[in-house]
Amino acid sequence: MTHPSFIRLRFAFKLSFAIVAALFLGFHLQLETPRWSVLTAAIVSAGPAFAAGGEPFSGAIRHRGWLRIIGTFIGCIGGLVIIVLTIRAPVLTLMLCCLWAGICTWISSLVRVENSYAFGLAGYTALIIIVTTGETPLLTPQFAVERCSEIVLGIVCAVMADLLFSPRSIKQDIDRLVDKVLVDQYRLLQLCIQPAEKSEIDRAWNELVKNTTSLNGMRSYLMMESSRWQRCNRRLQVLHTESLALITQACETYLVMSNHPEVISAELKTMLSEPAQTPAEIHQQMKKLRQFIAASHSEAIPHTISSWVGAATRYLLLSKGIQTNSSINQVEEDILAGDAPVKPISAEGHHAMINGLRTGIATAIGGLFWLWTGWTSGAGCMVMIAVVTSLAMRTPNPRRMALDFLVGVIIALPIGALYFMFIIPSTQQSMLLLCISLGVLAFIIGIEVQKRRLGSLGTLASTINIIVLSNPMIFNVRQFLDSALGQIVGCFVSLIVLLLIRDNAKDRTGRTLLNRFVYSAVSALTTNKTKRGENHLPALYQQLNQLLMMFPADIDKYRLALTLIIAHQRLNRTEIPVNAELSAFHKQIRSTAERVITVNNDQKRRYYFARLLQELDQYQQKLVDYQAADAVIRPVKRLTEMLRKYQSALI
């Protein structure tokens, strides 16, 4: 039952069943265009499979379905508003629609990747409605309602297929990853204490950051499966923070050991070097370490080690509750209540603007070309431009996604012609034969989609789109060729636009992310208890993971970012003297650090960065004047020296 071939075949059956059910119910319920139901069932089922490279989890399919419903409703409302306001000016209607598509793409580039699909869909849904009802604008409300109904039917069929063919729960994968992360955390600490080679430590914490991020991303899929996982979800959210704290403490231990190798006693080092390959062995190891720490003088144990043991103990407690999904006891409730993560601010503003411009300009060019030439395939071409540019922008490689669409629509032409001209006309008298013929196509493509074959997803969607499954069926060969040609030209234009309008915001976004780490470090300089109690680790590591995705080969950037995260944690636990003058100076430093992020001029950025360094030097002197402890002055001095050393990378 768990053999890879069986799982691939099972998903292919799921996809075939979802498409066939949507087709049958669409005709049975006398929907005008069952094609939308079939297309929705195909995209909702196959899209997550293509992204995952295998059978998707049940939560992923339902999450995709909800996003499609939300995006469709937003797009329908947007389309209706545009038509009501500009019904007497068709050109203005079309241009406003292009502007709407660009704005939706811009928003989709700013929100979380998991939710971006809804806004991308909203952008081109309004365009589809306006283009389709261009000659009969008074029927737009009816068309919008019908489209929403067809979309919901397709999603219901996709979810039903997943439930019938053994839904794949993500819970077992979460349990396995929770255990793996704990073992890897212990191994990272051992590497940092030895200490091992930098490259080996880099690989270890890099892998841990990715796995911890993946574990946090699985929460939404788990909640989509069933509401009974709410307790698990709460525990996983805090477990994510504890895992990030473990990474930070281990890496800080490495930095401390690099400068002061004698800080850890030989006895403690021997205990930490003992092997532990399972969570049970690590549990026993934590017992020994807690007893040793309790019996030792507080100054004999480095703060990073005692903090690491405390975080690992909380991790073990939460992981047990995650595996059993038992009721939350009072100890766990205290841990859960103490976590208040801060939401991260997107650093992709410029990148999002470029994405919105790409979609808006490309769609407007397609629309103007259609109006100027009167080309019968112009509407389909324009819609395809909007679809490709909206959906491709949020992927790691937009050009690769656009190429996938282009290959898919080219392959869909002969396959669609075979179905439209020969197979479907031959099955007109039998719904069973029609369902079997379409089911076979879905089954074959369902296997290829899981292999992430170039063009597989585009072939499935484009073939369903051009064979025009309407009620009643009309076999107009010229209309078929126009639709197929419009798809091909639209995808080609989209690829050309992506190649011509280059996104040069990568370096700028990377610099902004690094300066956000600087801001987070200096923002820890505060005496406000509420601000000091905020949990910045999830937001900081989300930005670090984004840096990893953008610059996969630039290890120096990761080290700098991680060092700044460690600096933030050091300053956050430092007991800063409560003083009105120091508090006012804290605000001034934060304001300067924020200006380093927000200014667009390089010369001004250098000015504010130099001013930030000057203010940090003045702040150190103020701490000396107010007779602050050396434990307070030292972290500020380290941060200042680090910023001065790496200022070329930050400005």
UniProtKB/Swiss-Prot annotation:
It is found in: Cell inner membrane. The chain crosses the membrane at residues 11-31, 41-61, 67-87, 91-111, 119-139, 150-170, 368-388, 405-425, 429-449, 455-475, 481-501. The keyword Transmembrane helix applies. It comes from Yersinia pestis. GO terms for biological process: carboxylic acid transport. InterPro entries: PHBA_efflux_AaeB/fusaric-R, PHBA_efflux_pump_AaeB. NCBIfam families: PRK10631.1. GO terms for cellular component: plasma membrane. Belongs to the aromatic acid exporter ArAE (TC 2.A.85) family. PANTHER family: MULTIDRUG RESISTANCE PROTEIN MDTO, P-HYDROXYBENZOIC ACID EFFLUX PUMP SUBUNIT-RELATED. Keywords: Cell inner membrane, Cell membrane, Membrane, Transmembrane, Transmembrane helix, Transport. This is p-hydroxybenzoic acid efflux pump subunit AaeB. It is a multi-pass membrane protein. One of its GO terms (molecular function) is transmembrane transporter activity. Forms an efflux pump with AaeA. Could function as a metabolic relief valve, allowing to eliminate certain compounds when they accumulate to high levels in the cell.
